[in-house]
Amino acid sequence: MNLKPTDYDFGVPEIYSFASNITCADEKTRQMFVLGYGHMLNYNHEEAIACFMKCTELDPNCAMAWWGIAYCVSSNYNWAPGLGSGYDAIQQALAVMGQCTDLEQDLITALSTRHTKEARDSADPSVLNMGNSPELNIAFAEAMAPIYEKYKGNLDVTAIYVEALMNLKAWQLWDKNTKTGEITPADENTLLLVKIMEDTFEQYDEAKVHPALCHLYCHALELSPFPERALPAADVLRTRMPGLGHLVHMPSHIDAWVCLLYTSDAADESSS
């Protein structure tokens, strides 16, 4: 069965207020961007790209749709090579961002550091060189740092920054001594990204139910010495965006590590 974008249950509208307030020409474009944004949160990047592409057909000057395409082809926590180069898309975003808000322009400018013409031209999918690189991921994380500070309290910006930090060592945030069993942070970056999320949860009640932050927190702590700290975030994801399978499945990453095996199976069953 092939699902249409509108077949997914994204939960209550306030979850994606960032997406529903982007600069664009009409409501149809806005609604399509919301769909793309939801799939982006769900790590369904191919479907997100299709939605963002539809946005650009409806409104070629929707800079954030071009940003979304570039973001979704970039390296991500589950697939470091990414899906391709976002250079052309982000250049288009830069070209049409004149009417955008300051926040949108800042996000577009930051993402432009992640994609270069040289990386695009040297891409070779046969060796999983898709036009992304660790060096470009570092550049993007560094570009997002001042934006995070400028818009502190904006939970979507916080999530984008945290994800940029996590992508610097995807699935390698923690080191385990196989002789002693001791688990320690891989580097200062791990401590930083965990602190950012935990401080945000403490300062903003809405952060505790923010799907992107809850998702990233589960990934950040699942291999840590204290996965149980992510149980509240996991509980949020069980029902927060019920049509998005990856987010509904995410609690099982924590459940398994804290030996809630029955709950883990239930989370996986709900996501299918």
Where are these regions (language model features)?
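Residue-level recognition of tetratricopeptide repeat
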Residues: 62, 154, 210-211, 244
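TPR repeat positional signature
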Residues: 32, 66, 73, 106, ...
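Inter-helical turn/loop elements of alpha-helical hairpins
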Residues: 42-47, 69-101, 109-126, 130-133, ...
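Alpha-helical segment of the N-proximal tetratricopeptide repeat
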Residues: 28-44
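Conserved small/polar residues in nucleotide/adenosyl-binding loops
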Residues: 262-269
